[in-house]
Amino acid sequence: MASDSSAQPKSVHEFVVRDARGNDVDLSIYKGKVLLIVNVASQCGLTNSNYTEMTELYEKYRELGLEILAFPCNQFGNQEPGSNEEVLEFACTRFKAEYPIFDKVDVNGSNAAPIYKFLKSSKGGLFGDGLKWNFTKFLVDKDGNVVDRYAPTTSPKSIEKDVKKLLGIQK
């Protein structure tokens, strides 16, 4: 939800979302951080490579200001059927994910989470705004502006240069 329902949100930082443990998280805590926001799934063909590379990217740039926000979603092929606890166990044990895992959300349709409505309206896809599959990635700058959207098949490693640019890292 945006803080003020009468005005359209202008930044990711205006949203409050629920984490996988049921706690509300005000995304304004990420002001000054570069964010990679990803809809994740445990049983997708893209799961292993994406989780592995997201963890590597996070370990490399976390101290420099990168945060990865993972939102489980079961809208694509029912590939995230588990409970929040099961998703946490899977991501944190199998892939050593130390970045935040949020409550399972819808990313498309009338029940889409407000944060995803904002992300999609900020950076539409090649064939419309709707997400086409798991592991669609949104890159957000330190001010909460959505600067890029990447297809599910775009590997996290391949966007490292864009992350570095937003972090102000040369080379």
Curated annotation (Swiss-Prot):
Coiled coil region boundaries: none
A single GO BP: response to oxidative stress
Keywords of the record: Cytoplasm, Oxidoreductase, Peroxidase
Gene Ontology CC terms, in alphabetical order: cytosol
Reaction catalysis annotation: a hydroperoxy polyunsaturated fatty acid + 2 glutathione = a hydroxy polyunsaturated fatty acid + glutathione disulfide + H2O
This enzyme's EC code(s): 1.11.1.12
PROSITE patterns: GLUTATHIONE_PEROXID_1 (PS00460), GLUTATHIONE_PEROXID_2 (PS00763), GLUTATHIONE_PEROXID_3 (PS51355)
Any one GO MF annotation of this record: peroxidase activity
Subcellular location: Cytoplasm
Disulphide-bonded residues: none
Active site: residue positions: 44
Main location: cytoplasm
Homology family: Belongs to the glutathione peroxidase family.
Role, per record: Protects cells and enzymes from oxidative damage, by catalyzing the reduction of hydrogen peroxide, lipid peroxides and organic hydroperoxide, by glutathione.
Record-linked PANTHER family: GLUTATHIONE PEROXIDASE (PTHR11592), PHOSPHOLIPID HYDROPEROXIDE GLUTATHIONE PEROXIDASE 6, MITOCHONDRIAL-RELATED (PTHR11592:SF118)
Name recorded for this polypeptide: Probable phospholipid hydroperoxide glutathione peroxidase
